[in-house]
Design a protein with these regions (language model features):
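Hydrophobic pocket/interface hotspot
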Residues: 344
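Aromatic (often tryptophan-rich) hydrophobic motifs at membrane interfaces
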Residues: 239, 256-269
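Conserved glycine-rich acetyl-CoA-binding loop
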Residues: 246-259, 272-273, 424-434
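Helix-loop element at the rim of GNAT/NAT acetyltransferase active sites that forms part
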Residues: 178-190, 347-361
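Non-catalytic interaction/regulatory modules that flank or connect domains
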Residues: 354-374
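C-terminal structured domain segments
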Residues: 398-475
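Conserved donor-binding loop and adjoining core beta-sheet/short helix segment
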Residues: 206-251, 391-427
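Structured alpha-helical
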Residues: 1-227, 264-279, 286-322, 430-431, ...
Length: 509
């Protein structure tokens, strides 16, 4: 049976006829749903953490079929769903029912408006004369700012030292970065040179709660002891960066913000407004913590279609003089076409099953980045991306992806760099690569630029001086069970709170 209004379907599901009246022109039917549960989303082992908070919230909505106002108590809730209680004798919810406008009301007149669907209904006390029903609601849509506030409230209720996108004192944040050693001498010189521009960028990211950025903070007596952030850097990809923790609390506090991050991904990735099809990060292979967490998770998942790692060589190219116009030799540089990207995808297929390129928005069928770039522009931030093909005798030798963003958006400047994919180093020279990068630098008015080179061996073959190596880690959140299984084991071993998915004493708000 399908019930709808002029705008949308309100209910669809199998029903049995309990009774009906007879009549030639009209009849009345009493129907009963045959199922107590629907499968709205793919079943996962690691679901959002359900919390009971006090005083209990309520939900208020206009019933889509009767038009009557309904108010129900909330039993538990998470970042992507909640459970409510109603009487079995007077129940009004059934699995499959859409609730186009539902207000979730918390203490202190805090209210979140969302769209939801009933996904299950079960009897809680069968033997009681006044038996009750527990009905589960899946959140389908909510305002972006409301979602950040709502999930942040749940994080803080679970651990009063955990914050999501809270107001951060910028002087304290910079002091924290210095004290943790996150900003080392080489990075300090870069920051000091561009300090005013970087300061303005971080004011925007940390005080205006933009849709493109999230930050997770662990505080002890008001002092920042751990930090991690995410930014939507490609159309459907979020970049994890700036993970740091303080002093003797490094391990535990670092794990805490990592747990927040994993929980946020679970709660958020299926909402369309998040545009979170992929999550990625870069780390140095000699850094033990990210290697253990991200590298270990990748090995544990052991499926490059769901999680993969790719090693890039890193160098910095400078344009030493105005006379250096970029000598390409026998090569030609042009805007990359779809056929060039298909050839790149074929080249990279063996290493990451295409996941790395999809995360970088470089696969042939990738969407354009107009919407995301406009989000940056509305905030007064810069975001540009262009892709070029370097060819010799019409044979594709390399692809160059140029990312431009505000200086310091990522403090390793990996959001403001050239990524070089070398398909055939035998048709290239070091001078041609240098010339291509210099040409791009001049056209974009850049004095120097970081360059990431893939595969790593290409830098060695072309005798390009390599300063360091970066590992790019990519994950499909839809298949994140393996990641959570691995990190939960580490969280259990590294914290005194036990399993993050185990039941806990209900916190107060």
């Amino acid at each position: 049976m399908v019930l709808s209004n002029e705008n949308e379907i309100l209910y669809s599901g199998e029903c049995r006829i309990v009774s009906n009246t007879s009549g030639c022109r009209t009849r009345e039917y009493v129907l009963e749903p045959t199922q107590d549960r629907i499968q709205r989303f793919e079943r996962k082992q690691y679901r959002s953490i359900r919390q009971e908070i006090f005083p209990p919230p309520t939900v208020v909505f206009e019933h889509p079929l009767t038009g009557r106002l309904v108010s129900l108590n909330v039993l538990d809730l998470s970042g992507c769903g909640l459970a409510v209680e109603e009487s079995q004798r007077s129940g009004v919810l059934m699995p499959g029912l859409m609730l186009p406008q539902l207000d979730l009301c918390l203490a202190g007149n805090v209210k979140f408006r969302c769209r939801a669907q009933v996904v299950y209904r079960r009897v809680m006390d069968c033997d009681s004369a006044n038996s009750r029903l527990k009905c589960g609601l899946a959140l389908l849509d909510i305002d972006v700012a409301d979602h950040v506030q709502f999930v942040g409230l749940l994080h803080h209720a679970s651990d009063q030292r955990s914050y999501l996108c809270n107001q951060v004192d910028m002087d304290e944040l910079w002091s924290f970065f210095f004290e943790t050693g996150f900003i080392y001498p080489e990075k300090y010189g870069f920051i000091h040179k561009n300090r005013e521009q970087i300061k303005q960028t971080y004011e925007t990211l940390y005080t205006r709660t933009p849709n493109i950025a999230r930050h997770f903070v662990h505080q002890d007596r008001g002092r920042i002891v751990a930090h991690m952030a995410m930014i939507r850097f490609y159309d459907t990809t979020w970049l994890i960066h700036h993970h740091a923790a303080l002093g003797n609390q490094t391990y535990r506090a670092g794990l805490n913000v990592l747990g927040q991050l994993g929980r946020f991904i679970t709660d958020s990735h299926r909402f369309p407004f998040m545009n979170m099809e992929y999550v990625t990060c870069f780390y140095r292979p000699e850094n033990h913590f990210p290697k253990r967490i991200f590298g270990g998770a990748c090995q544990s998942i052991d499926d490059p279609k769901r999680c993969c790692e790719t090693i890039f060589a890193y160098c910095r190219v400078r344009c030493d003089s105005k006379e250096d116009q970029g000598d390409l030799g026998d090569c030609r540089l042009s805007v990359a076409e779809a056929d060039d990207l298909r050839e790149l995808a074929s080249f990279c297929q063996h290493d990451s099953s295409g996941l790395m390129l999809r995360a970088l928005n470089l696969d042939p069928g990738a969407s354009d980045q107009t919407g995301m770039i406009e989000e940056f522009r509305r905030l007064g931030l810069r975001r540009e991306r262009s892709v070029y093909a370097l060819k010799s005798d019409e044979q594709l030798q390399a692809i160059l992806m140029v990312n431009l963003a505000d200086i310091g958006l990522n403090l390793s400047d990996l959001t403001n760099c050239v990524t070089l994919f070398v398909l055939d180093h035998r048709g290239l020279t070091r001078e041609a690569v240098h010339g291509a990068v210099v040409l791009l630098m001049k056209s974009l008015d850049q004095e120097q630029v970081p360059v990431l080179i893939y595969p790593e061996v290409a830098a060695e073959c072309l005798k390009i001086p390599v300063e360091k190596r970066y590992v790019m880690w990519s994950l499909v959140p839809q298949f994140s069970d393996g990641f959570h299984r691995y990190t939960d084991a580490i969280l259990r071993a590294g914290t005194k709170y036990g399993d993050s998915h185990a039941k806990r004493r209900p916190p107060s708000v």
